[in-house]
Amino acid sequence: MAILRAKEIRGMSDKELDKQLKDLRNDLLKQHAISATGGAPENPGRIRELRRTIARILTIKQEKKQKEMKR
C-alpha cells in the first residue's frame, strides 16, 4: 500500500476513509506482531509510514467534521 498524501485523502468519501483506516490499522497490527516476535521486518520504515498515514486520515476526518459543525 502506497503512502497517501493529504490531497488524495481529502478527495475520498467518508466510507472510503473508514475502509482505508481499517486496512491501515490491520497492516500496522501485523507489522507490530512481526517485530514483537523477534522477526526482522522487510521494510523497517513501514511502521512509521503506517502510523503517519493513519494520523493524516484521522486529522482530515476531524477537519471535515469541524467544517460541517460550523455550517
From Swiss-Prot:
GO molecular function annotation: structural constituent of ribosome
Transmembrane regions: none
UniProt KW keywords: Ribonucleoprotein, Ribosomal protein
Record's keyword annotation contains Ribosomal protein: yes
Keyword check for Manganese: no
InterPro entries: Ribosomal_protein_uL29 (IPR050063), Ribosomal_uL29 (IPR001854), Ribosomal_uL29_CS (IPR018254), Ribosomal_uL29_sf (IPR036049)
UniProt xrefs under CDD domains: Ribosomal_L29_HIP
Entry's Gene Ontology cellular component terms: cytosolic large ribosomal subunit
Any Gene Ontology biological process: translation
One Pfam family matching this protein: Ribosomal_L29
UniProt family annotation: Belongs to the universal ribosomal protein uL29 family.
PANTHER family: 60S RIBOSOMAL PROTEIN L35/50S RIBOSOMAL PROTEIN L29, LARGE RIBOSOMAL SUBUNIT PROTEIN UL29C
Protein known as: Large ribosomal subunit protein uL29
Organism phylogeny: Archaea, Methanobacteriati, Methanobacteriota, Stenosarchaea group, Methanomicrobia
Gene that this sequence comes from: rpl29
